[in-house]
Amino acid sequence: MRAVLTWRDKAEQCIYDLAFKPDGTQLILAAGNRLLVYDTSDGTLLQPLKGHKDTVYCVAYAKDGKRFASGSADKSIIIWTSKLEGILKYTHNDSIQCVSYNPVTHQLASCSSSDFGLWSPEQKSVSKHKSSSKITCCSWTNDGQYLALGMANGIISIRNKNGEEKVKIERPGGSLSPIWSICWNPSREEHNDILAVADWGQKLSFYQLSGKQIGKDRPLNFDPCCISYFTKGEYILVGGSDKQVSLFTKDGVRLGTVGEQNSWVWTCRVKPDSNYVVVGCQDGTISFYQLIFSTVHGLYKDRYAYRDSMTDVIVQHLITEQKVRIKCRELVKKIAIYKNRLAIQLPEKILIYELYSEDSTDMHYRVKEKIVKKFECNLLVVCADHIILCQEKRLQCLSFSGVKEREWQMESLIRYIKVIGGPAGREGLLVGLKNGQILKIFVDNLFAIVLLKQATAVRCLDMSASRNKLAVVDENDTCLVYDIHTKELLFQEPNANSVAWNTQCEDMLCFSGGGYLNIKASTFPVHQQKLQGFVVGYNGSKIFCLHVFSMSAVEVPQSAPMYQYLDRKMFKEAYQIACLGVTDADWRELAMEALEGLEFETARKAFTRVQDLRYLELISSIEERKKRGETNNDLFLADVFSYQGKFHEAAKLYKRSGHENLALDMYTDLCMFEYAKDFLGSGDPKETKMLITKQADWARNINEPKAAVEMYISAGEHAKAIEISGSHGWVDMLIDIARKLDKAEREPLLMCACYFKKLDSPGYAAETYLKIGDLKSLVQLYVDTKRWDEAFALGEKHPEFKDDVYVPYAQWLAENDRFEEAQKAFHKAGRQGEAVRVLEQLTHNAVVESRFNDAAYYYWMLSMQCLDMAQDPAQKDAMLDKFHHFQHLAELYHGYQTIHRYTEEPFSFDLPETLFNISKFLLHSLTKATPLGISKVNTLFTLAKQSKALGAYKLARHAYDKLRGLQIPARIQKSIELGTLTIRSKPFHDSEELVPLCYRCSTNNPLLNNLGNVCINCRQPFIFSASSYEVLHLVEFYLEEGITDEEAVALIDLEAPRHKREGKWRETSSNNSQTLKLDETMDSIGEDDPFTAKLSFEQGSSEFVPVVVNRSVLRSMSRRDVLIKRWPPPLQWQYFRSLLPDASITMCPSCFQMFHSEDYELLVLQHACCPYCRRRIDDTGP
């Protein structure tokens, strides 16, 4: 139960009493010395009524709605009409305390401090009766025969309608417990009149008309000021000094709070025949609430448990319609039912019940366990040995002793949970979340299994009987059905609020919505019928439907889905549907359709249902013939048609199956001689060719194709024989003809090959093409039938067909989303333009989808493709420009992948130094236009954070300043603003440990280099590691003019000895890498190294002076110190000299990217390939 505030108003004086007009449209309030009339629909003050001279204490409306009365401290009573006009006024000797109209005679009882009076419209005077104490409250019984008076001395006086006392009830406590409010239960279903009494001894009690107390006093723990029943008497409202209105059952069990106020509640009433409650307070507040009583229930198969009267639980057997009531005498908060278990959550405990016996119809429950703990949960589920509590995003699994065994934390709010069965203690749960995620949880497993994730929130779930399909109703009222194994959305239907699978049929489900019940079988259209309520279960032909608070079992005929299956010739499925419940006529229709579809097993079962022995005998005979080896289905169907009286259809099938004699016998037996003569043969096949041809024409005209074919062959008319055989699909006859023909007869052989292709016999077609030597047609055949291996083999033997094979193959690969293979196939076919176009599209898609590693790889492949195309002199310059451009983009995207992962994903495993190096590399590389997909914001944000973390405060401040000029996403806006402020507190310089060193001139370069990734002193370009992006200790050098690459390698390989110390470099070369490593006794490069002299340059020059070496320098170099990028022509090889002896560098022989050896080995172990060009370690060539 929850209370929703509809409207609220504030009067200037205390609200002592109020009354509803019986039709509920108006509300009369006693506020100060006036009456206030409100419209209950929106809280509009209609009119204030003046007439009293002092505070109005009470007001009451007559049951017929014609009059209402008010009593005041000015000792007067005013009678008002429903038109808000005062018509009568009379007085007492003291202030008026309460008034009440007789519900039958409309007699008015008015009570003061010393007496009470009875007035009716028929009498002119008011009969008054003295009272021994101050009367505080009064109430008439339902039949209007008795009036109960509550007094300040703790006595309740029950009088007849003439004022004579009949019963006197003395409350314990006497005058210390004044009676402050009383009310008779208005229910007509109660056997006795029941009076509810609230006194200032802070007790709530109940009495019969005889004065006998019902049950014990109920403690309230506050001074009650008002008590009021609901219209049907099922609930009680009590308000008072606790500044709130409490809801009780008619037995006095507290259920909850309607509304908390800021002052004492002096009066509260229920709007007639509704769940609206109005509250009047000491401070003049009027609050109008709507009470919403939610349905608390649980369902498992044919057992349905629901809450009744808020404190009882009723278990209903939906098949037998038996019901059993379990009285809890406390507020029932949650109910869960599963097999023989029933769990009921009360405010301070959970009760677990079990059935007495294993009988499926047993309805006797007994308490199995009690968990005496208070739990707060949204959903409750019971299993064989556990209780599952759902709290927002968390699930807790408790044993029946209350011990928490397991807990699951979800990503989003849990919207739906259902037990889907399983062994005791290992049951499975189906859980639907608000974020659209659907999980399966086993109570003995800590890890949830994600079944699928959809975009919309889950409202309802159900799993099919075999657990292969999942039906989901989302917040858009759409029913979606998924294949659990493939996650594929099978179909979806609109206007659904609940869904249930048939427990006896895998492919049937029903869902409700929009006032209709929808039944869907497989993927067929929905069958609808009108039905109000929510579908909660589907068992066989019964659908369990919940409407408001009532659960009912609806019998639904299964004819419609059965005929849907029959239309698709799905006979076995149609039989399964029929077993759920159809008529005899439906069974016969199913049997006939199955028999015509040659589904004899289904037909036999269906005919058995309708006990048709004649057709059962036919089915038995056909099955016996099939056991003997007969396989001609047309012949079987012809027999079926003849049994059904469809003689002409039977004759056609006999003819089609080659058993014209059976048709002849059939027509003869039926004395249908006119039809029988159509099956008579004529002519002698041994006559002349002309006669045979005419006979063949006649046979063809009378639909005797086989005979016609044989005759045409005998007559040498092969073309006509092939035409007839091909049109009838006789492949065996066609291949016989083709094999008998000479290879010189090209036209008929080509006709045979054409028919073979049409009849899906590519092997025979290939044999025919080979026979006539038509290799081009054979290649086309292989391509059309996707027999690529044969096509490739033929292309290798005959290169002139290579283009005819690889181009269609590449197009087929592209159509099947195998783009990388398609690109290679285009390349192999010499279609460079298509190959490049495929790569460009792949690259663009990778960038758009933020797959930057793939983008880098595709750009590298593009560059190598362009380098290959640059061998054409006409395209050399353009292709080399593209090569360098794509190489540059590949390096950018390769580095940016790490930045993207760091900024977009919740966790990053990259070192701060790596992130710092990459972002600095990108910053210096993005001096011009920024490529698509690369975010300067992310790059600068990463650089700023890592610079600050590593002590490069000056660079961090520069990055934050740059960010101020860019459009920042909202998710990192606060982080950047905070970083911009905090960086100001740091010193304005960078850590010396981070400053990059030029290995040529030993100059310390600033972190922010206006020249980009080159030395500011000597302009020597930096060589970066492709993994950590640290500056490598390499210097590129160039060969003196006249020295070829082969001569240079030969000079380097001479390895002239060094006299100072032994050279200790060790080189490891393989197909996968070229590695320099240092032996333990390695000495640094001496000052007498000729290469060192070549590193010098002219100071102060702004031009880059490359290092150029001659033969003597090359001869002095050790092969172990040199790395060579052996680019294919027209590019020149690139040479690099290692200047530090204490670090090992590895270069990939395919993409020529440099790595620290340890990094490269780790990355190759992780990916089994080069991280840059994806060259696998088991590849033998570069």
From Swiss-Prot:
Give one Pfam family. Answer: Zn_ribbon_IFT122_C
Where this protein primarily resides, as one coarse class?
Answer: other
Q: Where are the WD repeats?
A: 10-50, 51-91, 93-129, 131-169, 174-217, 219-258, 260-300, 453-492
Q: What's a single GO CC term here?
A: ciliary basal body
Query: Which Gene Ontology BP terms does the record give?
Result: camera-type eye morphogenesis; cilium assembly; dorsal/ventral pattern formation; embryonic body morphogenesis; embryonic camera-type eye morphogenesis; embryonic digit morphogenesis; embryonic forelimb morphogenesis; embryonic heart tube development
Name the domain of life.
Eukaryota
**PROSITE patterns from the entry?**
WD_REPEATS_2, WD_REPEATS_REGION
Annotated localization: Cell projection, Cilium; Cytoplasm, Cytoskeleton, Cilium basal body
Q: Keywords, A to Z?
A: Cell projection, Cilium, Cilium biogenesis/degradation, Cytoplasm, Cytoskeleton, Developmental protein, Repeat, WD repeat
- What does the domain comment read? Forms the trimeric core subcomplex IFT122:IFT140:WDR19 via the C-terminal region, whereas it interacts with IFT43:WDR35 via the N-terminal region containing the WD repeats.
**What role does it play?**
As a component of the IFT complex A (IFT-A), a complex required for retrograde ciliary transport and entry into cilia of G protein-coupled receptors (GPCRs), it is required in ciliogenesis and ciliary protein trafficking. Involved in cilia formation during neuronal patterning. Acts as a negative regulator of Shh signaling. Required to recruit TULP3 to primary cilia.
Known partners and oligomeric status:
Component of the IFT complex A (IFT-A) complex. IFT-A complex is divided into a core subcomplex composed of IFT122:IFT140:WDR19 which is associated with TULP3 and a peripheral subcomplex composed of IFT43:WDR35:TTC21B. Interacts with IFT43:WDR35; the interaction connects the 2 IFT-A subcomplexes. Interacts with IFTAP; the interaction associates IFTAP with IFT-A complex.
Q: What is this protein called?
A: Intraflagellar transport protein 122 homolog
Q: Which organism is it from?
A: Mus musculus
Organism classification: Eukaryota, Metazoa, Chordata, Craniata, Vertebrata
